[in-house]
Amino acid sequence: MDRIRIVGGNELNGIIPISGAKNAALPLMIASLLTSDTLTLENVPHLADVELLMRILGNHGVDVAVNGRRERQEDSYSRTIHFTCRTIVDTTASYELVSKMRASFWVIGPLLAREGHCRVSLPGGCAIGTRPVDLFIEGLTALGATMEIDAGYINAKAPAGGLIGARYTFPKVSVGATHVMMMAATLARGTTVIGNAAREPEVVDLANCLNAMGAKITGAGTATITIEGVTSLSGARHRVLPDRIETGTYAMAVAMAGGDVVLENTDVALLETAVETLRRAGAEISSTNNGMRIKRNGAGIRPVDIVTDPFPGFPTDLQAQFMALMTRSSGVSHVTETIFENRFMHVQELARLGARISLSGQTAKIEGVQRLRGAPVMATDLRASVSLVIAGLAAEGETTVSRVYHLDRGFERLEEKLTRCGAIVERISE
Protein backbone atom coordinates (compact mmCIF):
# COMPACT_ATOMS: atom_id res chain seq x y z
CA MET A 1 0.00 0.00 0.00
CA ASP A 2 1.39 3.37 -1.02
CA ARG A 3 2.27 6.15 1.39
CA ILE A 4 3.07 9.79 0.81
CA ARG A 5 6.09 11.35 2.49
CA ILE A 6 6.17 15.11 3.03
CA VAL A 7 8.99 17.22 4.38
CA GLY A 8 7.46 20.48 5.56
CA GLY A 9 8.73 24.03 5.55
CA ASN A 10 9.00 24.90 1.83
CA GLU A 11 6.98 27.68 0.24
CA LEU A 12 5.03 26.91 -2.92
CA ASN A 13 5.89 28.91 -6.04
CA GLY A 14 4.92 28.20 -9.64
CA ILE A 15 1.95 27.02 -11.69
CA ILE A 16 -0.50 24.22 -10.87
CA PRO A 17 -2.83 23.05 -13.65
CA ILE A 18 -6.32 22.20 -12.39
CA SER A 19 -7.95 19.04 -13.70
CA GLY A 20 -11.53 18.48 -14.82
CA ALA A 21 -14.03 18.10 -11.96
CA LYS A 22 -14.54 14.58 -10.68
CA ASN A 23 -17.97 15.53 -9.35
CA ALA A 24 -19.01 16.68 -12.82
CA ALA A 25 -17.30 13.94 -14.84
CA LEU A 26 -19.09 11.09 -13.06
CA PRO A 27 -22.72 12.18 -13.78
CA LEU A 28 -21.69 13.26 -17.31
CA MET A 29 -20.31 9.79 -17.99
CA ILE A 30 -23.51 8.22 -16.64
CA ALA A 31 -25.55 10.44 -18.99
CA SER A 32 -24.08 8.43 -21.90
CA LEU A 33 -26.61 5.69 -20.97
CA LEU A 34 -29.44 8.00 -22.14
CA THR A 35 -28.59 7.82 -25.86
CA SER A 36 -27.54 5.28 -28.47
CA ASP A 37 -25.22 7.90 -30.02
CA THR A 38 -21.71 8.83 -28.91
CA LEU A 39 -21.16 11.29 -26.07
CA THR A 40 -17.67 12.80 -26.20
CA LEU A 41 -16.31 14.33 -23.02
CA GLU A 42 -13.19 16.53 -22.96
CA ASN A 43 -11.07 17.41 -19.93
CA VAL A 44 -11.85 14.14 -18.10
CA PRO A 45 -9.52 13.71 -15.10
CA HIS A 46 -7.41 10.61 -14.66
CA LEU A 47 -8.68 9.31 -11.29
CA ALA A 48 -9.43 5.96 -9.70
CA ASP A 49 -13.18 6.80 -9.51
CA VAL A 50 -13.34 7.67 -13.22
CA GLU A 51 -11.57 4.44 -14.22
CA LEU A 52 -13.90 2.41 -12.02
CA LEU A 53 -17.00 4.05 -13.48
CA MET A 54 -15.76 3.30 -17.00
CA ARG A 55 -15.65 -0.38 -16.07
CA ILE A 56 -19.12 -0.19 -14.48
CA LEU A 57 -20.60 1.50 -17.58
CA GLY A 58 -18.90 -1.15 -19.74
CA ASN A 59 -20.99 -3.73 -17.88
CA HIS A 60 -24.18 -2.00 -19.02
CA GLY A 61 -23.00 -1.98 -22.62
CA VAL A 62 -21.15 1.34 -22.97
CA ASP A 63 -18.15 1.22 -25.31
CA VAL A 64 -15.41 3.52 -24.10
CA ALA A 65 -12.68 4.89 -26.38
CA VAL A 66 -9.96 7.12 -24.91
CA ASN A 67 -8.08 9.48 -27.25
CA GLY A 68 -4.35 9.05 -27.04
CA ARG A 69 -2.18 11.91 -25.77
CA ARG A 70 -1.50 14.58 -28.34
CA GLU A 71 1.80 16.23 -29.13
CA ARG A 72 2.09 19.51 -27.31
CA GLN A 73 -0.23 18.45 -24.53
CA GLU A 74 2.62 19.42 -22.20
CA ASP A 75 1.31 19.85 -18.71
CA SER A 76 -2.29 19.03 -19.14
CA TYR A 77 -3.13 15.41 -18.67
CA SER A 78 -6.76 15.83 -19.42
CA ARG A 79 -8.23 13.24 -21.71
CA THR A 80 -10.95 13.15 -24.30
CA ILE A 81 -13.12 10.05 -23.98
CA HIS A 82 -15.92 8.80 -26.24
CA PHE A 83 -18.82 6.89 -24.66
CA THR A 84 -21.21 4.94 -26.90
CA CYS A 85 -24.10 2.87 -25.61
CA ARG A 86 -25.84 1.45 -28.72
CA THR A 87 -27.92 -0.95 -26.62
CA ILE A 88 -28.12 -1.49 -22.88
CA VAL A 89 -27.06 -5.12 -22.41
CA ASP A 90 -27.61 -5.36 -18.66
CA THR A 91 -30.03 -3.38 -16.49
CA THR A 92 -28.61 -4.75 -13.21
CA ALA A 93 -25.97 -2.79 -11.25
CA SER A 94 -24.46 -5.32 -8.88
CA TYR A 95 -23.54 -4.84 -5.26
CA GLU A 96 -19.88 -5.67 -6.08
CA LEU A 97 -19.70 -2.58 -8.25
CA VAL A 98 -22.02 -0.12 -6.50
CA SER A 99 -20.44 -0.84 -3.11
CA LYS A 100 -17.07 0.29 -4.49
CA MET A 101 -18.41 3.64 -5.55
CA ARG A 102 -21.53 5.46 -4.51
CA ALA A 103 -21.95 7.46 -7.67
CA SER A 104 -22.50 4.29 -9.70
CA PHE A 105 -25.93 4.08 -8.00
CA TRP A 106 -26.90 7.03 -10.21
CA VAL A 107 -27.23 4.72 -13.24
CA ILE A 108 -30.74 4.07 -11.83
CA GLY A 109 -32.04 7.29 -13.48
CA PRO A 110 -30.92 6.70 -17.09
CA LEU A 111 -31.56 2.93 -17.01
CA LEU A 112 -35.13 3.48 -15.82
CA ALA A 113 -35.74 6.26 -18.35
CA ARG A 114 -34.34 4.38 -21.34
CA GLU A 115 -35.23 0.76 -20.59
CA GLY A 116 -38.27 1.15 -18.30
CA HIS A 117 -36.84 -1.14 -15.61
CA CYS A 118 -33.63 -1.85 -13.68
CA ARG A 119 -32.24 -3.54 -10.61
CA VAL A 120 -29.66 -1.49 -8.75
CA SER A 121 -27.86 -2.37 -5.53
CA LEU A 122 -28.15 -0.03 -2.57
CA PRO A 123 -24.80 1.75 -2.18
CA GLY A 124 -22.02 1.28 0.36
CA GLY A 125 -19.00 3.54 -0.30
CA CYS A 126 -17.22 6.38 1.47
CA ALA A 127 -17.70 6.48 5.22
CA ILE A 128 -19.52 9.77 5.57
CA GLY A 129 -22.64 9.25 7.58
CA THR A 130 -25.68 7.53 6.26
CA ARG A 131 -26.32 9.48 3.03
CA PRO A 132 -29.77 8.00 2.51
CA VAL A 133 -31.11 7.04 -0.86
CA ASP A 134 -34.70 7.95 0.12
CA LEU A 135 -34.49 11.19 -1.86
CA PHE A 136 -33.64 9.27 -5.02
CA ILE A 137 -36.48 6.80 -4.48
CA GLU A 138 -39.04 9.53 -3.76
CA GLY A 139 -37.94 11.60 -6.73
CA LEU A 140 -38.23 8.68 -9.18
CA THR A 141 -41.52 7.54 -7.61
CA ALA A 142 -42.91 11.03 -8.32
CA LEU A 143 -42.17 10.33 -12.03
CA GLY A 144 -44.45 7.29 -11.84
CA ALA A 145 -41.85 4.58 -11.14
CA THR A 146 -42.59 1.74 -8.73
CA MET A 147 -39.67 1.00 -6.44
CA GLU A 148 -39.34 -2.03 -4.23
CA ILE A 149 -36.38 -3.00 -2.10
CA ASP A 150 -35.48 -6.68 -2.29
CA ALA A 151 -32.37 -8.33 -0.78
CA GLY A 152 -30.33 -5.11 -0.77
CA TYR A 153 -31.40 -4.16 -4.31
CA ILE A 154 -33.92 -1.65 -5.64
CA ASN A 155 -36.16 -3.09 -8.33
CA ALA A 156 -37.39 -0.10 -10.28
CA LYS A 157 -40.06 -0.16 -12.93
CA ALA A 158 -41.49 2.66 -15.05
CA PRO A 159 -45.18 2.70 -16.05
CA ALA A 160 -46.10 1.30 -19.48
CA GLY A 161 -45.09 3.95 -21.99
CA GLY A 162 -42.31 5.35 -19.79
CA LEU A 163 -41.84 7.84 -16.95
CA ILE A 164 -44.30 10.71 -16.57
CA GLY A 165 -43.35 14.32 -15.83
CA ALA A 166 -44.32 15.65 -12.39
CA ARG A 167 -43.65 18.35 -9.81
CA TYR A 168 -41.44 17.24 -6.96
CA THR A 169 -39.74 19.27 -4.22
CA PHE A 170 -36.80 17.69 -2.41
CA PRO A 171 -37.16 17.87 1.40
CA LYS A 172 -33.41 18.62 1.55
CA VAL A 173 -30.84 19.55 -1.03
CA SER A 174 -29.09 16.57 -2.61
CA VAL A 175 -26.67 16.93 -5.50
CA GLY A 176 -26.78 13.23 -6.41
CA ALA A 177 -30.58 13.04 -6.32
CA THR A 178 -30.84 16.24 -8.43
CA HIS A 179 -28.51 14.69 -11.04
CA VAL A 180 -30.53 11.47 -11.18
CA MET A 181 -33.94 13.06 -11.33
CA MET A 182 -32.81 15.49 -14.01
CA MET A 183 -31.42 12.66 -16.17
CA ALA A 184 -34.53 10.51 -15.73
CA ALA A 185 -36.88 13.43 -16.49
CA THR A 186 -35.20 14.23 -19.85
CA LEU A 187 -36.96 11.21 -21.40
CA ALA A 188 -40.20 11.41 -19.35
CA ARG A 189 -43.52 12.29 -20.99
CA GLY A 190 -44.53 15.86 -20.19
CA THR A 191 -42.89 18.46 -17.99
CA THR A 192 -41.02 17.89 -14.72
CA VAL A 193 -40.39 20.64 -12.19
CA ILE A 194 -37.78 19.93 -9.50
CA GLY A 195 -38.07 22.15 -6.41
CA ASN A 196 -35.28 22.72 -3.84
CA ALA A 197 -32.83 21.44 -6.47
CA ALA A 198 -29.08 21.50 -5.86
CA ARG A 199 -27.47 24.65 -7.35
CA GLU A 200 -23.92 23.32 -7.63
CA PRO A 201 -21.89 24.19 -10.77
CA GLU A 202 -21.68 20.43 -11.51
CA VAL A 203 -25.49 20.32 -11.81
CA VAL A 204 -25.32 23.21 -14.28
CA ASP A 205 -22.60 21.37 -16.19
CA LEU A 206 -24.76 18.26 -16.50
CA ALA A 207 -27.77 20.33 -17.63
CA ASN A 208 -25.62 22.05 -20.30
CA CYS A 209 -24.42 18.69 -21.58
CA LEU A 210 -27.94 17.16 -21.59
CA ASN A 211 -29.21 20.25 -23.48
CA ALA A 212 -26.45 19.77 -26.04
CA MET A 213 -27.79 16.19 -26.40
CA GLY A 214 -31.26 17.56 -27.19
CA ALA A 215 -32.86 17.81 -23.72
CA LYS A 216 -34.95 20.82 -22.78
CA ILE A 217 -33.79 21.91 -19.32
CA THR A 218 -34.10 25.42 -17.88
CA GLY A 219 -33.32 26.85 -14.45
CA ALA A 220 -30.18 24.80 -13.64
CA GLY A 221 -28.12 26.68 -11.07
CA THR A 222 -31.32 27.93 -9.36
CA ALA A 223 -33.49 26.12 -6.82
CA THR A 224 -36.13 25.27 -9.45
CA ILE A 225 -35.23 23.21 -12.53
CA THR A 226 -37.80 22.62 -15.29
CA ILE A 227 -37.39 19.74 -17.75
CA GLU A 228 -39.60 19.28 -20.79
CA GLY A 229 -39.42 15.60 -21.71
CA VAL A 230 -38.23 14.60 -25.22
CA THR A 231 -38.60 11.23 -26.96
CA SER A 232 -34.87 10.65 -27.44
CA LEU A 233 -31.45 12.22 -26.95
CA SER A 234 -28.57 12.32 -29.40
CA GLY A 235 -24.80 12.44 -28.98
CA ALA A 236 -22.83 15.60 -28.17
CA ARG A 237 -19.40 16.93 -27.37
CA HIS A 238 -18.93 18.56 -23.96
CA ARG A 239 -15.99 19.84 -21.92
CA VAL A 240 -16.02 18.96 -18.20
CA LEU A 241 -15.83 22.08 -16.05
CA PRO A 242 -12.74 22.67 -13.83
CA ASP A 243 -12.58 21.02 -10.41
CA ARG A 244 -13.49 23.69 -7.86
CA ILE A 245 -12.57 21.39 -4.95
CA GLU A 246 -9.11 20.79 -6.36
CA THR A 247 -8.81 24.55 -6.98
CA GLY A 248 -9.78 25.32 -3.37
CA THR A 249 -7.49 22.61 -2.01
CA TYR A 250 -4.39 24.00 -3.72
CA ALA A 251 -5.35 27.53 -2.79
CA MET A 252 -5.46 26.42 0.86
CA ALA A 253 -2.14 24.61 0.47
CA VAL A 254 -0.53 27.90 -0.68
CA ALA A 255 -2.21 29.82 2.16
CA MET A 256 -0.75 27.22 4.54
CA ALA A 257 2.76 26.92 3.17
CA GLY A 258 3.14 30.51 1.91
CA GLY A 259 4.40 31.44 -1.55
CA ASP A 260 2.90 32.57 -4.86
CA VAL A 261 1.11 30.15 -7.19
CA VAL A 262 -1.03 30.50 -10.31
CA LEU A 263 -3.82 27.92 -10.59
CA GLU A 264 -4.48 27.38 -14.30
CA ASN A 265 -7.60 26.20 -16.22
CA THR A 266 -10.00 27.10 -13.45
CA ASP A 267 -12.40 29.85 -12.53
CA VAL A 268 -12.72 31.92 -9.33
CA ALA A 269 -16.48 32.22 -9.88
CA LEU A 270 -16.90 28.49 -9.11
CA LEU A 271 -15.93 28.92 -5.48
CA GLU A 272 -16.54 32.50 -4.42
CA THR A 273 -17.44 31.64 -0.80
CA ALA A 274 -14.25 29.66 -0.28
CA VAL A 275 -12.12 32.35 -1.96
CA GLU A 276 -13.69 35.06 0.21
CA THR A 277 -12.99 32.92 3.30
CA LEU A 278 -9.35 32.53 2.29
CA ARG A 279 -9.03 36.27 1.78
CA ARG A 280 -10.33 36.81 5.32
CA ALA A 281 -7.71 34.32 6.52
CA GLY A 282 -4.98 36.50 4.99
CA ALA A 283 -4.37 35.16 1.48
CA GLU A 284 -4.22 37.46 -1.54
CA ILE A 285 -6.26 36.04 -4.41
CA SER A 286 -6.74 37.60 -7.83
CA SER A 287 -8.30 36.38 -11.08
CA THR A 288 -6.10 35.68 -14.09
CA ASN A 289 -7.27 35.21 -17.68
CA ASN A 290 -7.64 31.42 -17.25
CA GLY A 291 -7.56 30.90 -13.51
CA MET A 292 -6.44 32.56 -10.31
CA ARG A 293 -3.30 33.64 -8.50
CA ILE A 294 -2.87 33.10 -4.81
CA LYS A 295 -0.18 34.61 -2.59
CA ARG A 296 0.41 34.79 1.11
CA ASN A 297 2.69 37.34 2.60
CA GLY A 298 4.45 36.55 5.84
CA ALA A 299 1.75 38.09 8.06
CA GLY A 300 0.44 34.73 9.24
CA ILE A 301 -3.00 33.17 9.08
CA ARG A 302 -6.02 34.84 10.67
CA PRO A 303 -8.75 32.74 12.33
CA VAL A 304 -12.06 32.55 10.42
CA ASP A 305 -15.25 30.70 11.38
CA ILE A 306 -17.05 28.71 8.69
CA VAL A 307 -20.28 26.73 8.35
CA THR A 308 -20.56 24.25 5.48
CA ASP A 309 -23.64 24.68 3.32
CA PRO A 310 -24.93 23.61 -0.07
CA PHE A 311 -23.77 25.78 -2.97
CA PRO A 312 -23.21 28.78 -2.99
CA GLY A 313 -22.19 28.25 0.71
CA PHE A 314 -18.83 26.93 1.92
CA PRO A 315 -18.36 23.45 0.36
CA THR A 316 -18.29 20.45 2.70
CA ASP A 317 -15.60 19.01 0.41
CA LEU A 318 -13.20 21.80 1.50
CA GLN A 319 -14.00 21.63 5.20
CA ALA A 320 -11.13 19.30 6.16
CA GLN A 321 -8.59 21.31 4.13
CA PHE A 322 -9.72 24.57 5.74
CA MET A 323 -9.50 23.03 9.20
CA ALA A 324 -5.90 22.05 8.46
CA LEU A 325 -5.18 25.67 7.54
CA MET A 326 -6.82 26.95 10.73
CA THR A 327 -4.54 24.80 12.92
CA ARG A 328 -1.84 27.42 12.25
CA SER A 329 -4.02 30.52 12.69
CA SER A 330 -3.25 33.22 15.21
CA GLY A 331 -6.38 32.60 17.32
CA VAL A 332 -9.48 30.44 17.75
CA SER A 333 -11.70 29.42 14.82
CA HIS A 334 -14.81 27.25 14.53
CA VAL A 335 -15.78 24.86 11.77
CA THR A 336 -19.42 23.67 11.70
CA GLU A 337 -20.34 20.78 9.43
CA THR A 338 -24.01 20.71 8.42
CA ILE A 339 -23.97 18.36 5.43
CA PHE A 340 -22.49 15.03 6.55
CA GLU A 341 -22.60 13.85 10.11
CA ASN A 342 -19.32 12.03 10.69
CA ARG A 343 -17.08 14.21 8.62
CA PHE A 344 -14.53 15.00 11.32
CA MET A 345 -12.47 11.85 11.01
CA HIS A 346 -9.38 13.93 10.20
CA VAL A 347 -9.45 15.66 13.59
CA GLN A 348 -7.61 12.97 15.52
CA GLU A 349 -5.01 12.66 12.77
CA LEU A 350 -4.37 16.44 12.72
CA ALA A 351 -3.99 16.22 16.52
CA ARG A 352 -1.06 13.82 15.95
CA LEU A 353 0.74 16.70 14.21
CA GLY A 354 0.19 18.92 17.23
CA ALA A 355 -3.12 20.61 16.31
CA ARG A 356 -5.43 21.66 19.14
CA ILE A 357 -8.97 20.79 18.14
CA SER A 358 -11.96 19.99 20.34
CA LEU A 359 -15.31 18.71 19.08
CA SER A 360 -18.77 19.53 20.28
CA GLY A 361 -21.59 18.03 18.16
CA GLN A 362 -21.28 19.39 14.62
CA THR A 363 -18.73 22.05 15.51
CA ALA A 364 -14.98 21.81 15.82
CA LYS A 365 -13.11 24.46 17.78
CA ILE A 366 -9.56 24.97 16.52
CA GLU A 367 -6.99 26.79 18.62
CA GLY A 368 -4.18 27.87 16.35
CA VAL A 369 -0.66 26.72 17.32
CA GLN A 370 2.72 28.23 16.56
CA ARG A 371 4.00 25.11 14.92
CA LEU A 372 3.02 21.64 13.81
CA ARG A 373 5.46 18.71 13.93
CA GLY A 374 5.60 15.92 11.38
CA ALA A 375 4.31 12.46 12.35
CA PRO A 376 2.93 9.31 10.71
CA VAL A 377 -0.82 9.80 10.02
CA MET A 378 -3.55 7.87 8.28
CA ALA A 379 -6.09 9.01 5.72
CA THR A 380 -9.72 8.10 6.47
CA ASP A 381 -11.49 9.49 3.43
CA LEU A 382 -10.75 11.46 0.31
CA ARG A 383 -10.91 15.03 1.64
CA ALA A 384 -9.44 14.14 5.02
CA SER A 385 -6.41 12.66 3.32
CA VAL A 386 -5.54 15.86 1.50
CA SER A 387 -6.02 17.94 4.68
CA LEU A 388 -3.16 15.90 6.18
CA VAL A 389 -1.00 16.69 3.16
CA ILE A 390 -1.73 20.43 3.61
CA ALA A 391 -0.83 20.23 7.31
CA GLY A 392 2.32 18.26 6.44
CA LEU A 393 3.49 21.06 4.09
CA ALA A 394 3.69 23.43 7.07
CA ALA A 395 4.80 20.92 9.74
CA GLU A 396 8.42 20.73 10.92
CA GLY A 397 10.19 17.60 9.79
CA GLU A 398 8.64 14.62 8.07
CA THR A 399 4.99 13.55 7.79
CA THR A 400 3.97 10.26 6.19
CA VAL A 401 0.35 9.77 5.13
CA SER A 402 -0.75 6.16 4.73
CA ARG A 403 -3.83 4.79 2.92
CA VAL A 404 -3.33 7.24 0.06
CA TYR A 405 -5.66 5.25 -2.18
CA HIS A 406 -8.26 7.68 -0.84
CA LEU A 407 -6.31 10.52 -2.45
CA ASP A 408 -6.12 8.81 -5.81
CA ARG A 409 -9.90 8.78 -6.00
CA GLY A 410 -10.06 12.56 -6.24
CA PHE A 411 -6.69 14.21 -6.85
CA GLU A 412 -4.82 13.73 -10.07
CA ARG A 413 -1.00 13.69 -9.80
CA LEU A 414 -1.05 15.49 -6.46
CA GLU A 415 2.57 14.86 -5.54
CA GLU A 416 3.77 15.89 -9.00
CA LYS A 417 1.77 19.15 -8.97
CA LEU A 418 3.10 20.09 -5.51
CA THR A 419 6.69 19.04 -6.22
CA ARG A 420 6.81 21.27 -9.28
CA CYS A 421 6.10 24.20 -6.98
CA GLY A 422 8.95 23.39 -4.63
CA ALA A 423 7.30 21.13 -2.04
CA ILE A 424 9.03 17.93 -0.96
CA VAL A 425 6.29 15.36 -1.51
CA GLU A 426 6.98 11.83 -2.70
CA ARG A 427 5.09 8.61 -3.02
CA ILE A 428 6.57 5.55 -1.38
CA SER A 429 5.36 2.27 -2.82
CA GLU A 430 5.72 -0.73 -0.58
UniProtKB/Swiss-Prot annotation:
Family, per entry: Belongs to the EPSP synthase family. MurA subfamily.
GO molecular function: UDP-N-acetylglucosamine 1-carboxyvinyltransferase activity
EC number: 2.5.1.7
InterPro entries for this protein: Enolpyruvate_Tfrase_dom, Enolpyruvate_Tfrase_sf, MurA_subfamily, RNA3'P_cycl/enolpyr_Trfase_a/b, UDP_GlcNAc_COvinyl_MurA
Keywords, in A-Z order: Cell cycle, Cell division, Cell shape, Cell wall biogenesis/degradation, Cytoplasm, Peptidoglycan synthesis, Pyruvate, Transferase
Pathway in which this enzyme or protein is active: Cell wall biogenesis; peptidoglycan biosynthesis
Residues annotated to bind UDP-N-acetyl-alpha-D-glucosamine: 102, 131-135, 172-175, 317, 339
Cytoplasm is among the record's keywords: yes
NCBIfam families in the cross-refs: murA, PRK09369.1
GO annotation (BP), single: regulation of cell shape
Binding site for phosphoenolpyruvate: 22-23
EC primary class: transferase
GO cellular component, one term: cytoplasm
Function: Cell wall formation. Adds enolpyruvyl to UDP-N-acetylglucosamine.
Catalytic activity: phosphoenolpyruvate + UDP-N-acetyl-alpha-D-glucosamine = UDP-N-acetyl-3-O-(1-carboxyvinyl)-alpha-D-glucosamine + phosphate
Gene responsible for this protein: murA
Residues recorded with modification 2-(S-cysteinyl)pyruvic acid O-phosphothioketal: 126
Organism in which the protein naturally occurs: Rhizobium johnstonii (strain DSM 114642 / LMG 32736 / 3841) (Rhizobium leguminosarum bv. viciae)
Active-site residues, record numbering mapped to chain: 126
Location(s), subcellular: Cytoplasm
Protein name: UDP-N-acetylglucosamine 1-carboxyvinyltransferase
